[in-house]
Amino acid sequence: EPVPLDIKVILLGEPHIYYLLSMYDPEFSELFKVAVDFDYRMDRTSGSQQLYARQIATLARQESLRPLDRYAVGRVIEHSARLLEDREKLLTHTRSLTDILREADYWAERQGHDTVTREYVQQSIDTRIHRADRVREHMQEEIRRGTMLIDSEGERTGQVNGLSVIDLGNFMFGRPSRITARVRMGDSGVVDIEREVELGGPIHSKGVFILSAFLGARFLPEQPPALSASLVFEQSYGDIEGDSASSAELFALLSALADAPVRQSIAVTGSVNQQGDIQPIGGVNEKIEGFFDICNMRGLTGDQGVIIPASNVKHLMLREDVRKAVEDRRFSVYAIDSVDDGIELLTGIPAGLPDDKGRFPDGSINRRVQQRLEHYSETMQSYAGKGSKGQPAGSGTPS
């Protein structure tokens, strides 16, 4: 028989689960009419950091952990911003922080200390990464042994070091990828080889279409295009998704068209729009650190660095060793706003600004690209004109 029941049921979970239940279960919204969506982040201000420090102390007491000194608390706050990839925000999800505190307390106990210091918080973070970085170590070994080809010095035409992020669930890391471009006269446009073999996702393909539109609008606004070009991620055997490499792909194309070598000591990340603006991307810290690790493994020269979108500067929460190398001028992080900024850094040649007629200064990168594309277009039109002087279509001996 039915039993009388008067209760309140409260569900806690991820927002996307709530959205799915509301979409697929018609009774769910009737049963759970009041929804509260808690934000997982908050602004990082002096006041919020004080509140955060109190919360850390409360968590330590609740877990019966040793107290943290001020430097340890500061390191936990830094790590919180790092988890969000935003130095202006703090994570409100306490479970991740509690795990760090427990492990830091363990290291303090092993050393016989009554207080958790910054050293033990850092050791907790480092050991958590070490337990999960087998794949990263394997990829770095492949690069070190020359199995995976990545240049970090010298110059190459039509070749740029792009950067990607591999997400293993509980650990993310960045890795460089060689992006190459080849160009010739033709009418096939820019061919994305990843898309042709169904390894490139829709967002990546969108990025290639955007850079194709940028090329045509900037350099040949009133002439038919006569370009056949190919873009590929070398030694890539899995799916590629996202548009964060579209600027690197565009730089490879510009280098090939201008016949201008690109510095291999600089890696690139950032998406591009049709106006040539460089747009922000995700995983900026992991990408910088991924290229830094390769350069550091081979020896830092002071000439190496990474180009990032200027709008990503507020997201920088780099590892301490990377920050130290930047401070000592042994490694650089360049923030750019436009395609022109990036191509000048990579080639050392001025990009050049157009005049009222859309012509770029002689000797500039943009002028060299413009001349190559105009040559292709004029040559293609001359071939078409010669063909039209022959027999009309349909003439000749019937079969």
Language model segments and positions:
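Generic, well-ordered alpha-helical scaffold segments in large soluble proteins
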Residues: 31, 55, 59, 75, ...
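Peripheral, non-AAA+ core regions of ATP-driven protein-machinery
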Residues: 183-199, 205-399
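A glycine-rich phosphate-binding loop feature that marks nucleotide/adenosyl-phosphate handling sites
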Residues: 8, 75-79, 96-100, 119-127, ...
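Conserved C-terminal "switch" segment of AAA+ ATPases
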Residues: 20-95, 110-115, 221-226, 259-265, ...
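AAA+/SF3 P-loop NTPase mechanochemical coupling elements
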Residues: 1-13
